[in-house]
């Protein structure tokens, strides 16, 4: 019913931007200052005003200089103090006023309006004077809803229409927001922006995977069942390793089969202590893990079709199977170590995993300093539905990660901060989950693993699931 009314009757699109709003902050200040100043002056002069007699004032007029100075100074200070207090107490309202002022100024500075000179008669005179009159001002609307800012611009077939469609980057930079989405509505283009993205950062304890969804920020989640495979890029000190460890912890807590490939034998390789026979650092071991993962995926797909509850279009989760996550860190460095035959073999395995893995529940998470197309050829890179860059990157690096998108990239020296493409086509500012100083990943992953194994043992003992289903595999795979 609401859709019917919205389509055929009036629909609220936000507060319309008017020409006077280019002085919005000054007007808001004056609206606070003037009443407070006058009220304060009245309180100082109330005795004189209550007993005011015009004839006596004219006859015995004298300047009460001390009271005048005192009242004016105090009233000004009180009015200014009211403005300052309003700024802090009503900061959100101030930001809205400032945003509307910036948009109005953008309209004037870019000359997105039309005007003409008209003749007007002077007051108290028969002479005429020329005055500018705005004959066209674009219909732009500003709305704040659910922590997002919506800027709607009417597509009215004016000569500015094509330029309106390309305002996303200007709005993003000018309002210091993150462009989340751009969509066409009936007669309008709508820019959806998020202000102060950092406020949506979550703790590592909140990054808990469930039902095919892993929350990474309050407004960003990796829906790995729908958007399979993740590509993570980031230089030294960008927070890439901690981010991968955070995802590993969440996947272990989910009960997934986690396999780790770390050719540099660095931080991820230390997880051998808590994930025995699941961590590979040598060339032969990594190639073997990739090969056996592909074989296991193919066998699982065949097994799924033989299951009694198999249904066309459903995935591994529908059949009660656990996902398999393969974390491959510094894969570019690994590829550089291989000869041509081995490199083609590794690329073939990776291509099969990313092309066929979603249905069977096999997910690949690649980490590198930058995703060189040399080692992600044949469209493999396009199969990574969720992409994250952390730390400082060049424009070339951003281009490799996200392609040619309308985005104003800003580098900030903050660990765990970067950008993400979450499968919507838009690149969003991103902050990885907060990891407290001194956080022990080894013990937390070990505890998560113990909890999962205990829950699986209980489920098997009760007969609610089979031993195969609890392990997440329909076939036996060697991990040696």
From Swiss-Prot:
GO cellular component, one term: plasma membrane
A molecular function GO annotation: ATP binding
Annotated localization: Cell membrane
Swiss-Prot/TrEMBL keywords: ATP-binding, Cell membrane, Membrane, Nucleotide-binding, Transmembrane, Transmembrane helix
Domain of life: Bacteria
Residue stretches making up the FtsK domain: 217-399
Identification of the protein by name: Ftsk domain-containing protein YdcQ
Source species: Bacillus subtilis (strain 168)
């Amino acid at each position: 019913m609401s859709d019917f009314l919205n389509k055929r009757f009036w629909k609220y699109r936000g507060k319309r931007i008017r020409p006077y709003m280019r002085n919005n902050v000054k007007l808001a200040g004056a609206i606070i200052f003037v009443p407070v100043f006058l009220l304060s002056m009245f309180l100082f002069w109330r005795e004189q005003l209550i007993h005011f007699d015009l004839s006596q004032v004219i006859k015995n007029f004298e300047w009460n200089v001390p009271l005048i100075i005192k009242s004016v100074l105090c009233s000004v200070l009180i009015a200014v103090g009211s403005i300052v207090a309003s700024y802090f107490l009503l900061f959100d309202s101030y930001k809205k006023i400032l945003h509307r002022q910036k948009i109005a100024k953008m309209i004037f500075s870019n000359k997105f309006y039309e005007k003409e000179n008209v003749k007007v008669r002077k007051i108290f005179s028969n002479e005429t004077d020329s005055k500018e009159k705005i004959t066209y001002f674009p219909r732009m609307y500003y709305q704040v809803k659910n922590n997002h800012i919506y800027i709607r611009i009417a597509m009215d077939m004016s000569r500015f229409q094509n330029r309106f469609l390309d305002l996303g980057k200007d709005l993003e930079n000018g309002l210091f927001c993150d462009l989340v989405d751009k969509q066409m509505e009936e007669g309008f283009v709508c820019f959806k922006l998020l202000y102060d993205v950092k406020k949506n950062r979550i703790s590592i304890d909140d990054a808990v995977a469930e039902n095919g969804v892993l929350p990474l920020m309050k407004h960003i989640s990796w829906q790995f069942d729908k958007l399979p495979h993740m590509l993570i890029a980031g230089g030294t000190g960008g927070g890439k390793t901690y981010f991968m460890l955070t995802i590993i912890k969440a996947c272990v807590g989910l009960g997934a089969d986690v396999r780790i490939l770390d050719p540099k034998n660095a931080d991820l390789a230390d997880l051998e202590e808590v994930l025995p026979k699941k961590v590979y650092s040598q060339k032969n071991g990594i190639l073997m893990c990739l090969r056996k993962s592909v074989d296991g995926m193919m066998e699982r797909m065949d097994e799924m079709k033989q299951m009694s509850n198999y249904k066309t279009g459903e995935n591994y989760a529908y059949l009660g199977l656990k996902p398999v996550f393969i974390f491959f860190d510094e894969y570019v460095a690994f590829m550089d170590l291989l000869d041509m035959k081995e490199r083609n073999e590794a690329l073939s395995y990776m291509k099969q995993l990313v092309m066929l893995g979603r249905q069977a529940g096999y997910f690949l998470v690649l980490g590198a300093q930058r995703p060189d197309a040399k080692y992600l050829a044949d469209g493999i890179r396009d199969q990574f539905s969720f992409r994250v860059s952390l730390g400082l990157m060049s424009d070339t690096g951003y281009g490799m990660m996200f392609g040619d998108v309308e985005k104003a990239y800003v580098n900030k020296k903050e660990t765990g901060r970067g950008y993400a493409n979450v499968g919507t086509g838009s690149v969003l500012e991103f902050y990885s989950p907060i990891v407290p100083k001194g956080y022990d990943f080894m013990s937390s992953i070990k505890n998560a693993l113990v909890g999962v194994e205990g829950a699986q043992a209980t489920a098997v003992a009760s007969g609610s699931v089979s031993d195969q289903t609890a392990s997440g595999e329909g076939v036996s795979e060697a991990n040696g």
